[in-house]
A protein has these predicted regions:
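Extended amphipathic alpha-helical interaction segments
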Residues: 132-215
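Short, charged, amphipathic alpha-helical segments
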Residues: 103-107, 127-128, 167-170, 192-199, ...
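Bacterial N-terminal signal peptides that target proteins for export
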Residues: 1-8
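Bacterial N-terminal signal peptides
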Residues: 9-18
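Secondary-structure edge/capping motif, primarily at the C-terminal ends of alpha-helices
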Residues: 90-97, 116, 120, 155-159, ...
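Non-transmembrane, amphipathic alpha-helical segments
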Residues: 71, 75-82, 90-97, 101, ...
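A cross-kingdom marker for long, charged
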Residues: 214-263
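N-terminal Sec/ER secretory leader and immediately downstream segment
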Residues: 23-129
Length: 263
C-alpha cells in the first residue's frame, strides 16, 4: 500500500492520511500517539491517526473525492474557509493518485490565494504541485500542499489577518472530518470511531469563532458553522456510536456544502 497523507494545516491542524501494509492493531491507544500542541490543546498528530485508520481497512479514496465549487469572488471569510477545504481535498486526490484532480486543485489554491491577496506567496508552490503531480511524485506533492497552506497562513498573520488563518484551518478540518467519518462509517469499528474523539480540538475551534470581531462572528456562514460545531460537541464528548459517526458526517457535509455555496 502506498504511504500517503492528507494535510489540513495552518495555525491549528495538519491532517495526514497514511497507509502501509501491517496487521490491524488489537486496540488503538490514542494516549501513546505523538502529539502536537495548539495553544493549550494537545492532540494526536493526525498523520498517526490516519496511519491507524488505514490499518483498519482500505478506503476507496477516489470515491471520497468531490467536485467543489470554486468561488474566487465574495467575502473573505468564505474564501478562507474554502481554501482550507480545497487543500484537504488535494490530499484526498493524492491518496487516489488522481493526477488531473491534483493539478486542478493546485490551480484552485492559486486562484483562492489570489482572491485574498496572497497569490505571490504560493505561486511557486502551486506550479510545483502541478509539475510534480504530472510526474506522479506524490511525496513531493504532499510536501508542496503542506507548504502552500503554511505559507498562506504566515502571510495572513503578517497582514494582520490571523482570524482568516483560523478559518483556513477550520475549513480544512471540516472537510477532513467529513472524509474521516465517511471512511469510518463504511467500515465501522470502535477503534475507528475513537479517532473522532477530539473534544479539546473542537473546543479550540469554537473558542476561535466566539473570539472573532462581531463583523466576522455575525457573518451568516460563520454563524452556521458555529451552530454546526455546537451540534457536533455532544456527539464526541461521549462514546462514539455508529449513529454518532453518521450524524457527524451529515453535519460536516452540510457545513462543507455551505462553504461551497454560502447557503
Amino acid at each position: 500500500m502506498n504511504r500517503c497523507r492528507i494535510v489540513f494545516v495552518t495555525t491549528v491542524l495538519v491532517l495526514a492520511i497514511s497507509g502501509f501494509a501491517e496487521a490491524p492493531p488489537n486496540h488503538i491507544d490514542l494516549s501513546k500517539f505523538p502529539a502536537t500542541q495548539l495553544d493549550d490543546v494537545v492532540v494526536p498528530l493526525p498523520s498517526e491517526v490516519f496511519n491507524v485508520l488505514d490499518k483498519l481497512g482500505t478506503p476507496n479514496w477516489q470515491g471520497e473525492l468531490r467536485e467543489p465549487v470554486i468561488r474566487n469572488r465574495g467575502e473573505r471569510t468564505q474564501i478562507a474557509l474554502m481554501l482550507g477545504a480545497v487543500v484537504a481535498e488535494g490530499f484526498v486526490a493524492v491518496e487516489a493518485a488522481d493526477k488531473g484532480r491534483v493539478q486542478q486543485i493546485g490551480r484552485d489554491v492559486l486562484e483562492l490565494a489570489r482572491a485574498i491577496g496572497v497569490e505571490s506567496t504560493v505561486l511557486s508552490r502551486t506550479n510545483s504541485i502541478i509539475t510534480k503531480a504530472d510526474a506522479g511524485n506524490w511525496v513531493a506533492v504532499r510536501r508542496e500542499l503542506d507548504g502552500a497552506l503554511t505559507d498562506v497562513k504566515n502571510a495572513m498573520i503578517e497582514l494582520k489577518d490571523a482570524q482568516l488563518a483560523h478559518l483556513v484551518s477550520l475549513g480544512g478540518w471540516l472537510r477532513g472530518t467529513e472524509v474521516l467519518t465517511s471512511v469510518v462509517q463504511k467500515s465501522y469499528s470502535e477503534d475507528g470511531a475513537d479517532l473522532l474523539n477530539q473534544p479539546d480540538l473542537l473546543k479550540y475551534f469554537q473558542e476561535r469563532l466566539a473570539g472573532m470581531p462581531p463583523r466576522m462572528r455575525n457573518n451568516q456562514l460563520v454563524t452556521k458553522i458555529q451552530k454546526g460545531l455546537d451540534e457536533i460537541s455532544p456527539l464526541i464528548n461521549q462514546k462514539i456510536t455508529p449513529g454518532s459517526v453518521k450524524r457527524i458526517n451529515e453535519i460536516t457535509g452540510q457545513m462543507v456544502k455551505a462553504i461551497d455555496t454560502r447557503a
